[in-house]
């Protein structure tokens, strides 16, 4: 008799040309939802996939008497769970009349990235997504002793060993699954707090940075579901003398990457300073608990920048200063930030 694992891993390619498409969307509180459908294929162009719908009253995105929300396929990735020709589909959300619903942040971001002035600058983003793995039964990072606290931070950052690195199997599974899916995941590392990790997505151009980060988050949620662990994107999951969790956003334009780009970078940083309050308001919930001026953060109340300064709002790398061109890092976004909002806002502020 076939086991459950055997059935889950069934290869359908020899018996049917049908494939499974997992449609993914963002709900009312910034969580991820998904459901699957059977299609004939294969398909590698999202415009050739059918639109679909879901019950918005069950996701906080529509009233019960008019609950249908339409999901538009926007980006396709290979499915690392079902494998074969099966796909993950990142979608955004609309009314039946074709208007983006309020929680659809991708639509406005796509408009900004399609602006001729923005498109001409070919904006690159690299996002450092920090997250914390928590025990399912209690709100405590994995690696915490039952009824107690781990030793102070210091040995956990890029640490190895059973007393320093907790959850590496999840991290490596996620790393490989993202590569399989076609996400440009560029690395992983253990972070400063026990049970805290980081993966990096990018460089990615324009709207694709948001698509790739959201699907990477989805894959992480699915893997932790299998492992029986909870993934938290809270910017300060554990109060006290512990680092928070951010989503540092590295950014460059064509002009910044060319000769003389450092001067363009400094002008862009000056523009960010003039809109510090607006950016902070859009950079994630609970960020005031993280941006305290301690634990490698700048104060939420004051904009600052510097070369190699991880206590600044914006950091410029030594290599960029030395070469006179390159990129900068906006260190303000929280781990739970909306990547469509953050990336498009940075581009809009610095280019338009």
From Swiss-Prot:
* Annotated PANTHER family: GLUTAMINE SYNTHETASE, GLUTAMINE SYNTHETASE CYTOSOLIC ISOZYME 1-3
Q: Name one GO cellular component term.
A: cytoplasm
Q: What is this protein's name?
A: Glutamine synthetase cytosolic isozyme
PROSITE patterns cross-referenced by the UniProt entry: GLNA_1 (PS00180), GLNA_ATP (PS00181), GS_BETA_GRASP (PS51986), GS_CATALYTIC (PS51987)
Q: Which residues form the GS beta-grasp domain?
A: 19-98
According to its UniProt record, which protein family does this protein belong to?
A: Belongs to the glutamine synthetase family.
The UniProt entry, under InterPro entries, shows: Gln_synt_N, Gln_synt_N_sf, Gln_synth/guanido_kin_cat_dom, Gln_synth_cat_dom, Gln_synth_gly_rich_site, Gln_synth_N_conserv_site, Glutamine_Synthetase
Domain GS catalytic stretches: 105-352
Alphabetically ordered keywords of this record = ATP-binding, Cytoplasm, Ligase, Nucleotide-binding
Q: Which cysteines are joined by disulfide bonds?
A: none
Sorted alphabetically, the Gene Ontology BP terms of this entry are:
glutamine biosynthetic process
Show the catalytic activity: L-glutamate + NH4(+) + ATP = L-glutamine + ADP + phosphate + H(+)
Q: Its quaternary structure?
A: Homooctamer.
Q: Which domain of life is it from?
A: Eukaryota
Q: Where does the protein principally reside?
A: cytoplasm
> Which major enzyme category is it?
ligase
Its Enzyme Commission number(s) read: 6.3.1.2
Example GO molecular function term?
A: ATP binding
Cell location: Cytoplasm
* Source organism per UniProt: Daucus carota (Wild carrot)
Answer whether the UniProt record assigns the keyword Ubl conjugation to this protein: no
């Amino acid at each position: 008799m076939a086991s459950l694992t055997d059935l889950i891993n069934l290869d359908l390619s020899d018996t049917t040309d049908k494939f499974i498409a997992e449609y993914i969307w963002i709900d009312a509180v910034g969580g991820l939802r998904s459901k699957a459908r059977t299609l004939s294929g294969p398909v590698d162009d999202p415009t050739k996939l059918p639109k679909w719908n879901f019950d918005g009253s069950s996701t906080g995105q529509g009233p019960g008497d008019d609950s249908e929300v339409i999901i538009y396929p926007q980006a396709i990735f290979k499915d690392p769970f079902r494998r074969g020709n099966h796909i993950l589909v990142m979608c955004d959300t609309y009314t039946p009349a074709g208007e983006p619903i309020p929680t659809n942040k991708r639509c406005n971001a796509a408009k900004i990235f399609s602006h001729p002035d923005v498109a001409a600058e070919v904006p690159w983003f690299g996002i450092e997504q920090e997250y914390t793995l928590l025990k399912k039964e209690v709100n405590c990072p994995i690696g915490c002793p039952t009824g107690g606290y781990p030793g102070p931070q210091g040995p956990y950052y890029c640490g190895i060993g059973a007393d320093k690195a907790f959850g590496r199997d999840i991290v490596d599974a996620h790393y490989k699954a993202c590569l399989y899916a076609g996400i440009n995941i560029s690395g992983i590392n253990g972070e400063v707090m026990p049970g805290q990790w980081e993966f990096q997505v990018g460089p990615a151009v324009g709207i694709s940075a948001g698509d790739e980060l959201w699907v990477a988050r989805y894959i992480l949620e699915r893997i932790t579901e299998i492992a029986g662990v909870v993934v938290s994107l809270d910017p300060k999951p554990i109060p006290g003398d512990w680092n928070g969790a951010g989503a540092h956003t590295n950014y460059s334009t064509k002009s910044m990457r060319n000769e003389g780009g450092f001067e363009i970078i400094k002008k862009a940083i000056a523009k960010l300073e003039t809109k510090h309050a607006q950016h902070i308001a859009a950079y994630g919930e609970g960020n005031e608990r993280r941006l305290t001026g301690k634990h490698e953060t700048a104060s939420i109340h004051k904009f600052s920048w510097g070369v190699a300064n991880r206590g600044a709002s914006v950091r410029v790398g030594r290599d960029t200063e030395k070469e006179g061109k390159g990129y900068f890092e906006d260190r303000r976004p929280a781990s739970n930030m909306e990547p469509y909002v953050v990336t498009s806002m940075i581009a809009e502020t610095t280019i338009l």
